[in-house]
Design a protein with these regions (language model features):
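Function-determining sites in protein domains
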Residues: 313-424
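Membrane-cytosol interface motif
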Residues: 43-48, 145-162, 231-239
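Hydrophobic alpha-helical transmembrane segments in integral membrane proteins
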Residues: 132-143, 304-315
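Internal/C-terminal transmembrane anchor helices
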Residues: 42-50, 287-312
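Active-site recognition of the HExxH zinc-binding catalytic motif
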Residues: 185-198, 205, 233-234
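Short helix/loop segments within enzyme catalytic domains
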Residues: 195-196, 220-277
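Hydrophobic membrane-embedded segments
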Residues: 1-130, 134, 275, 312-314
């Protein structure tokens, strides 16, 4: 359960960076069509559901695996690696102080707490889904006695605001007290929801919220998704209306608004959220120019490229050390396997050989770390620009410590090539 929770935690953290970007874009793109905001939330959903991601130099995600399962379970001092120095420096000292491994223990204390957190997450997921099911069944019971007036359109005395109920075969339910003008405007709105497939997207958003209920940023994202769905639907309805019809539509919005405590799961209720903002948006609506629409599409593409991809991992010696072989002015190796460590300065040819062996290594990045057990050797490099890097080696792991530049030390699991490096 701990492994599942840590996987979801890392996906959640990666998506949180995207949510922050969407929040900024929502603030600065007031003139953009509202469907752009919904599309941006769709990109957030993709980030949450995709278990994999391609690597790209254009990625703006600081780290694809902020919390490494291997580091949490086995590292002497568990740490996170967000690649944001302010966050790492604030969190890691506390983790090291309270969750450092006990020499006689098989796993870190943090791993035990992570296992507990996994079961708490599962209970929370069950509670969220149970809430959705109970809300759906209660609403079904309320509308069980309804009068059909058209195909899949019903009048109901037990409701005060219209909504759509159902995912596969959606039905529109209208309060029986609506006059003809209100009914026409309400039906236009609800049918626009159906045309946009909003009766799919909102329940999907709630399911994702249920899975990631532990992340408050995603609660904010879901709330704004519900609001943006309504705004986008309003724009679809009023884009062909004249000024008088828009005013009538806005009046109906106010008349059909419902309390904020209304059900937030399956129903897509007319007037459900942000009524004041929706009325203001309707009254001031202007059809966006072509260049605004084109710019909105371009923004969505750029956001997808930058936030659906992961940052590239270190793939060669230059990536590990932080500078290329031709930039190295000094290199040495320390044999730490014996009681008395011995140090030898490497010649140019030996430095070439070490870089070639580092190039041949295959490894997986585990995360940030400050120490490593069973180190048998230490490599030390200095560049012409004064950059310094230390690499500590063990049988199955490698700790890369960029001494200069303010970067965090990184722990790697060695997959292949470590035997050749050790023998050399």
């Amino acid at each position: 359960m701990a492994a599942v929770f840590l996987k979801l935690l890392n996906l959640s953290i990666s998506a949180s960076w995207l949510v922050l970007a969407v929040l900024v874009l929502r603030l600065i793109s007031k003139r953009s069509p509202k469907w752009m905001n919904v599309l941006l939330w769709g990109i957030v959903a993709l980030r949450l559901v995709l278990p994999f991601s391609i690597e790209s130099a254009l990625s703006l995600i600081p780290s694809a695996e902020t919390v490494s399962p291997a580091v949490v379970q086995f590292a002497p001092a568990p740490t996170i690696t967000s690649d944001v120095s302010v966050i790492d420096n604030a969190v890691n000292p506390s983790l090291s102080e309270h969750f450092s491994a006990v020499p006689t223990a098989s796993v870190n204390p943090l791993y035990v707490w992570t296992e507990i957190a996994g079961w708490v997450w599962l209970i929370g997921l069950g509670a969220m889904l149970l809430y959705a099911l109970v809300s759906y069944l209660r609403l079904r019971r309320r509308v069980s006695v309804s009068l059909p007036i058209r195909d899949r359109i019903y009048l109901c005395d037990a409701i005060s605001s219209p909504f759509i109920l159902g995912v596969v075969k959606p039905h529109i339910y209208l309060p029986s007290g609506l006059d003809e003008v209100q009914r026409q405007n309400v039906l236009a709105h609800e049918q626009a929801h159906l045309a946009r497939r909003d009766h799919w997207w909102k329940p999907l958003g709630f399911v994702l919220l249920a899975v990631y209920w532990f992340n408050p940023v995603l609660w904010l994202a879901y709330t704004l998704l519900c609001r943006d769905i309504e705004l986008a639907c309003d724009e679809r309805v009023i884009r062909t209306m004249d000024e008088s019809a828009v005013k009538t539509y806005s009046t109906v919005l106010l008349a059909c608004s419902m309390p904020r405590k209304a059900v937030i799961t399956c129903p897509l209720a007319f007037g459900e959220v942000g009524v004041k903002e929706r009325v203001r948006n309707a009254l001031h609506y202007k059809k966006p120019a072509f260049w605004v629409v084109a710019a909105s599409v371009a923004v969505c593409v750029v956001v997808a490229v930058c936030f659906l991809t992961n940052p590239p991992t270190d793939t060669d010696a230059a990536g590990l050390v932080g500078f290329r072989r031709e930039q190295v002015t000094y290199a040495d190796v320390t044999d730490a396997s014996g009681a008395q460590p011995s140090n030898v300065q490497l010649t140019a040819e030996e430095t070439d050989a070490v870089y070639a062996l580092l190039d041949a290594l295959q490894y997986k990045r585990l995360g940030a770390a400050s120490a490593m057990e069973d180190c048998y050797a230490r490599l030390y490099f200095i560049s012409a620009a004064g950059e310094r890097c230390e690499i500590m080696l063990s049988e199955h792991e490698m700790l890369v410590n960029p001494i200069t530049g303010g970067k965090t030390a990184r722990l790697y699991e060695l997959r292949s090539g470590s035997t050749e490096l050790r023998d050399y």
